[in-house]
């Protein structure tokens, strides 16, 4: 179903289901078979959501070993690279003395529970109320405790999340580290720019930002993606990202941030794989997404 302007979701529907999909891939990366990342919460969170296809994926009940694009190790490797990028971003920020951290569209992200945060750190998680409530309750039922102070900001990012964040205690006068992981493609281009405008307005000099982006989201309407989606559907994965993403050129984002005083750096997904000791796949689908870009930035003004 195509997106509506004020659509809502939980972790089993629409954009929310993509958070469950990502968590399932994190669970594969964390599985002892591969042990590429440390995330003991991904698999139980996926099981708690109750989407059959992702529960079967984390429980190794989908026969995909012979399909190169759905090979579990391939999925695990890709998600490990992404997860390590954002994990290291936050750890580097702590080493620089930053003490407040904002995870936008936090989904089933458990970094507040699993990373080694310095004493006094505050992690703000911003997402839909339904998503925040589910994750908080599920992790509590699992007996998990945050590794540092965790403050939830239950708000739609299309609403006044900046005020809600400050109401939760965020201090715009001191540096912060922000992440927008797996978020930008689900925003219209103008909403993406507005998101970065808000981040800039709330950031003191020395603040840091990490995100990834697809320069041209038209790839999700490409025949290569359609072929992949059709194969996904055969296996039970019925999320059509082409109906969830907002199309448009995103390649301006680095220049946009630079004009606002951010010093940016970027890695293509191919370079990110290489930095983690992996070879990027060379099949049709991987080639289509070879310009996926991971970026970090520091506010210099």
Curated annotation (Swiss-Prot):
One GO CC annotation? peptidoglycan-based cell wall
Give yes or no: UniProt keyword Transit peptide.
Answer: no
What positions does the entry give for S-adenosyl-L-methionine binding? 127, 156-157
Per the record, the GO terms for biological process are: methylation
Q: Which GO terms describe its molecular function?
A: methyltransferase activity
A Pfam family it matches? LCM
**What InterPro entries is this protein classified in?**
Ppm1/Ppm2/Tcmp, SAM-dependent_MTases_sf, SAM_mthyl_Trfase_ML2640-like
Work out whether the entry's keyword set contains Methyltransferase.
Answer: yes
Which domain of life does this protein belong to? Bacteria
Question: EC no.?
Answer: 2.1.1.-
Q: What does this protein do?
A: Exhibits S-adenosyl-L-methionine-dependent methyltransferase activity.
Family statement = Belongs to the UPF0677 family.
Descriptive protein name? Putative S-adenosyl-L-methionine-dependent methyltransferase Rv0830
